[in-house]
Amino acid sequence: MDAYEATKVVFSRIQALDPDHAAKIMGFLLIQDHGEKEMIRLAFGPEALLHTVMAKARKELGLLPASGPGTPTSVAAAAAAAHSPFMLSRQNSGRCGTAPSPLSVSSPSSWAPPPVFSRNNSISNGAGEEMVGLGDELISPANGGGPPSPFFGGDPLMDELQLQDQLAFLNEGGVPAGHQMPMFDGGECRSPGGGDGGLFSYNLGWANGGPGHRRSASVSELCLGGADGLGWKPCLYYARGYCKNGSACRFVHGGLPDDAAGKMDPSAVEQQCQDFLIRSKSQRLAAAAFPYSPTGSLPGSPSAATKCLSLLLQQQQQQNESQRAAAAAALMLGGDEAHKFMGRPRLERADFASMMNPGSRQIYLTFPADSTFREEDVSNYFSIYGPVHDVRIPYQQKRMFGFVTFVYPETVKLILAKGNPHFICDARVLVKPYKEKGKVPDKYRKQHQPGERVDFSSCTTPTGLDARDPFDMHQLGARMLQHSNSANEMLLRRKLEEQQQAAELQQAIELHSRRLMGLQLLDFKSRAAAAPTPIGNPFSASQTAANATGESPPDSGELGKGSGFLLAHKKAVNGADKEESTGESSSPNTDSDQSVEHNLPDSPFASPTKSAGFARDPFAPTEAEISATASTGCSATYVGINNGASNGGTNHLLPSALDMPSPKPYFFPMSRLASDHGAIGM
């Protein structure tokens, strides 16, 4: 018997046992492609073996078992399983919410108890499904005397995605209506995704976090399937952005047909959504019950429940957008049906996008300063046009502007189209569109000169609008529906003028700030000129020295010169400015060639401490000389100078009396310019 005849025999036997699903079961067996020997074995095998194969196929395809007298019992299934001594179960999908059974790996020599955690997660749920679990253990010899391989497996790491894609033709519409797959629970027919790794740790393809896929239980059939089993099937790839099949795709592109909304029962759709939510929650709880599973920490793939919910939310959002567009058209036209859209009770999900841009829902009000209305009055007045969200009027003594925020942007368009003025409590109120700070287009920016500095970000009022109203908004509102181009030009012209005024104001502010900076600089200079010089003032010391030398003998002046010269000689390394200041300050004569005006330092930034030190040292003995002259005379003055230097009195820079040489051999008179011969004065 060849493979063709064996296939015909197997198909006839399957059709006799399950006529409803015979074609699908036979197609599944042919897809497995296990060779001619397996088909001949099924054709001549016992009926219990064929029942196990059919149960296996039903389980893979998600079909309900046919109830009839031919359904085998668990004893027959066990006998069929005992036909092969070597039993190695294949990985299969199971039903959610049931506990996995341990793998039975048996051999003729060892019949040890099976381990608890196994690579087979076949499910036994009652006596009617025990034969399904035993059917997983069907094996047959491969290539003669080689090791046994599963009938449905071959390679245990077979790609299940390719298998499910090959099964897609079994769910086409070409099958008779009587053989259509009825509505069933989606959670019991789809393969577990990555999130179900807690229950299915070693399933085929799931250990790598692969997505669950079951073409026989598509999302379109679960969510939108009709009573006849056909239903509308929106293309999920097209909803994501691209479908490679194009117009040849067997799913619907671009939404549902027009009559779909009428046929869909809203209560049934809502009930399906609730079922999906409950089922997905139970799956997450089941996955959390096994935290040490190899795939328990992997992210779950999008399940059928998530896809169905996102599809329903997308359709609801499209319906809300169409209703909102119809409401805007009715409000703009002012027809009889406008009152239907005035008071929508709550915000839809799509309205949050408009809330992100509050400028589209706000208007700017200007009114006289002597107005007496309150925020409640403004809210009550504008609630005629639509629901008001907020009213803000600054708390000022002379208030002249305010802001009104509406719930929907269509209300703002309706009020602006009506035009001005509005009267609230006998006060004339002008309505203007709310505009945020922005930039003028490039074609208007080119009108300014290149050298002109313009700052478009600044504005005269908190809203960027001037209090004046050069254009009548009533005419603008009338033209918005008829001549949109002219209205846009008018708005752009007004915006340009406002920003020009803002630029002029900015220039005036900068000019005023520059003037203030100039005044501050002048004030700073005057204060700096009036402040005392930080360096030591030589005039007081010089005048004291001049007064003292009038009473001292000439030798005391020579001694002062000599001591000052010695100090300058020892400190010559410190700079020429110190040497000159020391030499000049140590000459207390009133001669014309030794003027006091030469006591100025070379640098105006000299250190005040050093200059003060050198200004005090030459005159310290002079003060002692003044006190000594009144009591003892000139001779005591010399002794006082030497003793004061040797005892380390007031001046520690002077050398001791033993080391001090005679001052006269070291004194060299130098000619100086008098003050009247080019000396620099203050």
From Swiss-Prot:
Please list the residue ranges that the record marks as compositionally biased, kind Polar residues: 539-550, 583-593
Which Cys pairs are S-S linked?
none
ZnF locations on chain (C3H1-type): 229-256
Q: Which UniProt keywords are given for this protein, alphabetically ordered?
A: Coiled coil, DNA-binding, Metal-binding, RNA-binding, Zinc, Zinc-finger
Basic and acidic residues bias locations? 441-455
- Translocase: is it a keyword of this entry? no
Task: Give the start-end ranges of region Disordered.
Answer: 91-111, 441-460, 535-616
InterPro entries from the entry? AtC3H46-like_PABC-like, AtC3H46-like_RRM, Nucleotide-bd_a/b_plait_sf, RBD_domain_sf, RRM_dom, Znf_CCCH, Znf_CCCH_sf
Q: Which CDD domains match?
A: RRM_AtC3H46_like
Stretches of Low complexity bias are at 100-110
Origin: domain of life: Eukaryota
Sample GO molecular function, one term = zinc ion binding
Name of the protein: Zinc finger CCCH domain-containing protein 53
Originating species: Oryza sativa subsp. japonica
